[in-house]
Amino acid sequence: MPMPTVSMSPALTALIERAVARVRQSLPVEQAWPGGEFDRQLAQVALASEFALDTLARQPALLQHLAQPDPPPLPLPQFDPAQPQLWPAQLRRYRSAESTRLVWRDVLGLDSVEATLAGATQLAEHCLQCGLQALEQQFHTRHGKVVAADGSVQRLVVFGLGKLGGGELNFSSDVDLVYAYPQGGQSDGARPLAAEEYFARLGQQLARLLDETTADGFSHRVDLRLRPFGTAGRVALSFAGMDQYFQREGRDWERYAWLKARAVAGDIDAGEAWLETLRPFVYRRYLDFTALDGLREMKAAITAEVARHDRLDDIKRGPGGIREIEFLAQSLQLIRGGREPSLRERRLLPALQALVAAGQIDQENGQALSTAYRFLRRLENRLQMLRDAQTHALPQAPLDRERIALGLGYAQWSALLDALAPQRARVAAEFAELLAPRVRATAPDALADYWRALPDGDAAPLAGIGLNDPDGAHRALADFAQSSGVRALSDSARARLDRVMPALLHAATRASQPDAAVRRMLGLLQATLRRTSYLALLDEQPSALARLVDVLSRSALLAERLAAYPLLLDELLDTRISGPLPDRAALHAACAHTLHIDDTEAALRELNERRLALSFRIALATLDGRQQAVESTRQLAWLAEAVVQTVLHLARSDMLAAHGHVPGGSFAIVGYGSLGGLELGFGSDLDLVFLYDHPREVDASDGKRPLDAGRWFARLAQKVMALLAAETGAGRLYDIDVRLRPDGGKGALVSSLASYREYQRDRAWTWEHQALVRARAVAGDAALCDAFAQVRRDTLMRVRDTAQLHEDVRKMRARMRAELDRSDAGRLDLKQGAGGLVDLEFVLQAGVLGLAAQQPQLLDACDTPALIDALARTHWLPDESAAPLHQAHATLVDAGLSCTLDRRPRLIAPTPAIQQARGIIFNAARGQGLTFPLGKDETAL
């Protein structure tokens, strides 16, 4: 017998020779010995697993199967309903044989660690499914099938938790099961049972079939203790009972347990559908750092158990063990999985990859943890393969140590320990970092004492930290401390608040506007006290706390949005926040992702949350000076465009379901104003115009409830508007203004392409053609969008009388100045004031209207920067004026966006930079004979 090509002790050599000889002796005379390479392979397996050799001695027919180059899975056992007494032996022999095949493939390097874990999982599922199927038939004969009140037949659902649910079962593991059934009822057989008793008995018999140890061993150890109420709970619960339990009794550790849950036998479809309803329990909708509290408690209990039983050599529960990797990944999944569906992953290794992709673990750490996990799981499997024992402890017996080390390719035990130590150390360090004690710059004792003493005490401690109005801040803090929200906090939440408040006050002293920071901070806390997960975030993440106070001090708008939509706090922690912002395609993809949600209301809410988060990122980039305001307004327009396209898809789907579609019909949404001109602000409304077209011979939709074509498209436009303005838990998407449609407020909401073309040709005012310069199709059918673009070109390329054009432009500007300019002697209206943004727009629009007939390339532009460049290329604007006009435009947009971010009206005292920008715009207007009236602001010029 060739022995493995490693140096073994004489004792181990003799042991392997005896094991192989025993297998040879068990071989029937008529069965040929495979021979050749098989001898070496068998000796290699004998080194790693007594269990495998024992199985081969009892089932020598398995030898021929394993002698194949790539031995496939064994056929499932076939249970005879008439001979249930044979089922346990059949199941156990199958499990032993298939487990031996897994050992064979693992030891000989045919399978990766992941494949071995998946194979062990599939084996457990097959045993559960075969056993349950046989028992169900038996129960049908005795008791009939369970029928609910609605007449539907009910089946048992077997949920696999832990590693079974995650598809990563170790070689000799127990299986964590929970039994449930969709609805109550009664069986319809000769000996009827209520559903609860029926499924409890069925589940208990399934557990016994797998778990009992017989002369043939066991199939799988079954653990039912993770069911609701544990050993005190019912063996099987209806889905309604499960729902009630998790709503009222669900605990933090159960979120970890059910994160990996999967329906593995019985009515799998019903089980998976119910698990989807449990998702909000496992993954909270909002950022949830309270998950770390549950993790700390579980880790403390495990640490105590390890110490109590001297289990430092336990590679599962001990320091740097498998459990720490699992806890680390699962805690990050629970914290963010409610917001990021990609993190809702049952399997550990893909979960680590998802966390890296989401920026929650850096690439190097993610790779290190994955490597450590594979190392530990491979070692764990080999420990268990030795004797099919449910062990995670490193062996003490010298011979066992030698077998494990040599089987894994190490010359001696010490070499294996040397390889193991850095893996465990890396895991322990990463896990300790996650659960590290809260580290932050310690707030001065005076502030901590001040907060705890409220409402007693005075403002003296606040006077020394740089507040301009310490008395006002003191009153606000005292009122907050006595508020009903604070008084209603649990002890643990109050303890968090007592840690957070001094740190917040300390951070406020370093803010650019300390008084504003304190005032806005209290508003945010008051709005979020009901969700203690946000207190946990600030308690666990000092960097987020500092960033929050900085943002609050500099932006009243973002302070309001954070208070109204605390889910935005997640953005302060996202490592991607300081990187490049999403481009146009990424914004569209982010919004379109919501279309996979079947429920329109839920899709709308998700879309709004994404819009809020993305606009918040754009605002932070603007606030931090990481990009120019002109870029921010362009991105906001792209975002709005993506939202409108998504909403149109939702609205059209609803219309198709209710009324069918208009054959050959098309629909388009045109963006005017700041949306069309790619210069949208934070909180800006959207100027929209709706167009439609359809073949003349088609006069109605083709659904069950048909509408005439015009009415169908009007309903579609109304639905788009309703969805855009609908209130959701995340607010509403946009305010809509449709007054720029043909005939304004008196006109039809939706225009046919023909009527729109006729209106622009025959009845539109010059100012409407000016508005058309900045218009572009933002959503809808491509052919109609192209047709609109052609109408726009035809309209704007009309030959015009320059004098009349300039007169019309000046009159409209004078009218707007009189009605809309809010400037006064000391402040300029950045948009409507003299030399403001609208003056610049009018100059550019006049240039396009006057020149497009000779220079049609001008019509390729619709936004201010592109229009400046296009008109400069035609020399209508002097070449040397382009750069100054770009700068003037950027200066005014930046000033306006700064006002918006701090919730101030866009009225400011002109600075030298503003005055310079206005002068540039005045000069450009004068150069084209377009001197606009000064209006209210003339004294400031």
From Swiss-Prot:
Q: Which UniProt keywords apply?
A: ATP-binding, Magnesium, Multifunctional enzyme, Nucleotide-binding, Nucleotidyltransferase, Transferase
Q: Which GO terms describe its molecular function?
A: [glutamate-ammonia-ligase] adenylyltransferase activity; [glutamine synthetase]-adenylyl-L-tyrosine phosphorylase activity; ATP binding; magnesium ion binding
For this UniProt entry, what's an example GO CC term? cytosol
**Ranges where the record places region Adenylyl transferase:** 444-941
Question: What highest taxon heads this organism's lineage?
Answer: Bacteria
Instruction: Set out the biological process GO terms recorded for this chain's protein.
Output: regulation of glutamine family amino acid metabolic process
- What job does the chain carry out? Involved in the regulation of glutamine synthetase GlnA, a key enzyme in the process to assimilate ammonia. When cellular nitrogen levels are high, the C-terminal adenylyl transferase (AT) inactivates GlnA by covalent transfer of an adenylyl group from ATP to specific tyrosine residue of GlnA, thus reducing its activity. Conversely, when nitrogen levels are low, the N-terminal adenylyl removase (AR) activates GlnA by removing the adenylyl group by phosphorolysis, increasing its activity.
Its recorded name reads Bifunctional glutamine synthetase adenylyltransferase/adenylyl-removing enzyme
- What is the protein's species of origin? Xanthomonas axonopodis pv. citri (strain 306)
As recorded in Swiss-Prot or TrEMBL, the protein's gene is named glnE
